[in-house]
Structures are given as C-alpha cells and as structure tokens.
Amino acid sequence: MAEPRRGDLWLVSLGAARAGEPGKHRPAVVVSVDELLTGIDDELVVVVPVSSSRSRTPLRPPVAPSEGVAADSVAVCRGVRAVARARLVERLGALKPATMRAIENALTLILGLPTGPERGEAATHSPVRWTGGRDP
C-alpha cells in the first residue's frame, strides 16, 4: 500500500454512520501533517470526508474530478476525524494547493484556530467569521 501524504485523496472505510456523520466507503482528504504520518504516532490518520453533495459553503469547499473524485464533490470539513491507517483502502489522487487552502481555512474556522499575529497563542474564539447562511 502507498503511504498517505497530506493532501492525498484516499478511499476510506468509515464504517456505519451515526448522527449525521459521513459513513461507508467514501473518499477522504488526508489533513495530517506528513511528519505525523511517518513518526512514532503513525497509526492514526486525520481525514476530512468527501461527499458528492453539491451543497457548497465555506465549510464544504469543492473537490473536482481532476483531483481524484468521480464527480464534482465537497469536502465535509465538519466531519474531520482520525481513522486507523488500516481504514485507508486505496489512493485516488491528490488535491490542488488551492483546494487544500480552502479546506485548511474551513478547519481553522471549525476548530477556532488562531491565525495571523496571534498564532501560537491559545485561541479563545475563532478569528475567522462565518457570515454565510446555514451550513448543513
């Protein structure tokens, strides 16, 4: 099996879905940093599931067929999770840098991570503001 890298698109066995989670076999983007994928703690891989839904928002950036999905899709950033490396079934492709930036921006918002000058300090709130409608 190929080694996963940050920005790769993999078919992942997520198992049965619960409470709105994406489930079953589906594409997912590897968002773990490469150093963690080859280090001591390499059994878990952090991924963002991908859905063929066309409901795009800043929290669901588009993923194009040229990046490895079968049809226009979205990265479901609110579904970010760690999975066992054994759940990675097959490498499908790699995302373009602009797509990864959109996913990183969404994760920054969802996780309340600091940006800019306050980076490195504990965040008490997200510096990025959600101004769009409902994110399903």
From Swiss-Prot:
Question: Enzyme class, one word?
Answer: hydrolase
- Stretch list, region Disordered: 115-136
Protein EC: 3.1.-.-
Q: Which InterPro entries match?
A: PemK-like, Plasmid_toxin/cell-grow_inhib
For this protein, the record's Gene3D superfamilies field holds:
2.30.30.110
Name the GO terms of the biological process aspect. mRNA catabolic process; negative regulation of growth; negative regulation of translation; rRNA catabolic process; symbiont-mediated perturbation of host process
What molecular functions are annotated in GO for this chain?
DNA binding; RNA endonuclease activity
Which top-level group of life is the source organism from? Answer: Bacteria
What Pfam families does its record include? PemK_toxin
Q: Which keywords describe this protein according to UniProt?
A: Endonuclease, Hydrolase, Nuclease, Toxin-antitoxin system
Q: How is this protein organized at the quaternary level? A: Forms a complex with cognate antitoxin MazE7.
The role this protein plays is: Toxic component of a type II toxin-antitoxin (TA) system. Upon expression in E.coli and M.smegmatis inhibits cell growth and colony formation. Its toxic effect is neutralized by coexpression with cognate antitoxin MazE7. Probably an endoribonuclease.
What's this protein's name? Probable endoribonuclease MazF7
Organism field: Mycobacterium tuberculosis (strain ATCC 25618 / H37Rv)
Gene from which the chain derives: mazF7
